[in-house]
Amino acid sequence: MWGYVHLISWVAIVVLTVTALLIYSKSVKGFTMLQMINRVFYILVILSGIMMVQYSVKESWILAIFKILMGIIVIGVVEMLLSYRKQQKPTGMFLMIFIIVVVITVSLGFYLSGGYPLFN
């Protein structure tokens, strides 16, 4: 169950982040609302990650710790990306970092879980 919560929350964070970036010029209020909803999903990701860490540590504790750090970095990069967008500063670098870190984190997550819940 926690695997599904974790996966759905991560997908929601990525979708909400991209949507917030796209709608900022049209609706600052909508942007702020999406940013707040994103933060709720951070809590879900952290809680579900804590519940699942025992399984990934069995696979490889080094990779599990690295994945935890990458997850925290993703949250930090999303916050920086959205705050830079709100301040109307260039976001290209953070967008590139966001894509790279998300791909690494998702790859590690599926490796450590053996593909669960998506490929099982």
UniProtKB/Swiss-Prot annotation:
Which keywords describe this protein according to UniProt?
Cell membrane, Membrane, Transmembrane, Transmembrane helix
Any Pfam family from its record, for instance, is: DUF1516
Could you give one GO CC term from the UniProt record? plasma membrane
Q: Where can this protein be found?
A: Cell membrane
Q: How does it sit in the membrane?
A: Multi-pass membrane protein
User: Which ranges does the record mark as transmembrane?
Assistant: 3-23, 33-53, 62-82, 92-112
Key word Membrane present: yes
Family statement: Belongs to the UPF0344 family.
Q: What's the protein name?
A: UPF0344 protein lin2366
Q: Which organism is it from?
A: Listeria innocua serovar 6a (strain ATCC BAA-680 / CLIP 11262)
